[in-house]
Amino acid sequence: MVDTTKNTKLFTSYGVSTSKTVAPEMAAKLISKAKRPLLMVGTLALDPEILDRVVKISKTANIPIAATGSSLAALADKDVDAKYINAHMLGFYLTDPNWPGLDGNGNYDMVISIGFKKFYINQVLSAAKNFSNVKAIAIERGYIQNATMSFGNLSKAEHYAALDELVDFL
């Protein structure tokens, strides 16, 4: 079992609170309990190993995908519910309780992020952390301070194994 709760050295100094580390099993439980989760996918998920696991997460838990950057093209033929949105705009929209969501059925109660550079996703999730009730779980390779919960800093092999465990627990 991969220990995703270790090595949480901060590389940024902003914010008054930091995310709690989360193991794949607990992340899967929280994702399963969410009423309206959204999988937020960045361009770093274009790595075939990550992309395969993103598709498995989406299909296993029936979670729609917010495809940001150039990730939509890679998801187009994967038979998943993926829609394009700018990542910063998504962070802004998540703070609006009246936002209809990408499907018109209302805002989300949880966002799961994967495939982003650390400095970028920390800024995007800062809005959700400080101005909404939306919970954010970062299943990134690096520890994300502004998520509600995050994996720790992992090697590539540990990250792949942690994502596999997450899929198994969903």
Curated annotation (Swiss-Prot):
GO BP terms: methanogenesis, from acetate
Pfam families noted in UniProt: CO_dh
Record keywords: Methanogenesis
Cystine pairs: none
pH profile: Optimum pH is 8-9.
Pathway: One-carbon metabolism; methanogenesis from acetate
Coiled-coil regions listed in the entry: none
Mitochondrion recorded as keyword: no
InterPro entries linked: CdhB (IPR003704), DHS-like_NAD/FAD-binding_dom (IPR029035)
UniProt xrefs under NCBIfam families: cdhB
Family to which this protein belongs: Belongs to the CdhB family.
Assembly information from the UniProt record: Heterotetramer of two alpha and two epsilon subunits. The ACDS complex is made up of alpha, epsilon, beta, gamma and delta subunits with a probable stoichiometry of (alpha(2)epsilon(2))(4)-beta(8)-(gamma(1)delta(1))(8).
Job description of the protein: Part of a complex that catalyzes the reversible cleavage of acetyl-CoA, allowing growth on acetate as sole source of carbon and energy. The alpha-epsilon subcomponent functions as a carbon monoxide dehydrogenase. The precise role of the epsilon subunit is unclear; it may have a stabilizing role within the alpha(2)epsilon(2) component and/or be involved in electron transfer to FAD during a potential FAD-mediated CO oxidation.
This protein's name: Acetyl-CoA decarbonylase/synthase complex subunit epsilon 2
Organism of provenance: Methanosarcina mazei (strain ATCC BAA-159 / DSM 3647 / Goe1 / Go1 / JCM 11833 / OCM 88) (Methanosarcina frisia)
Encoding gene, per UniProt annotation: cdhB2
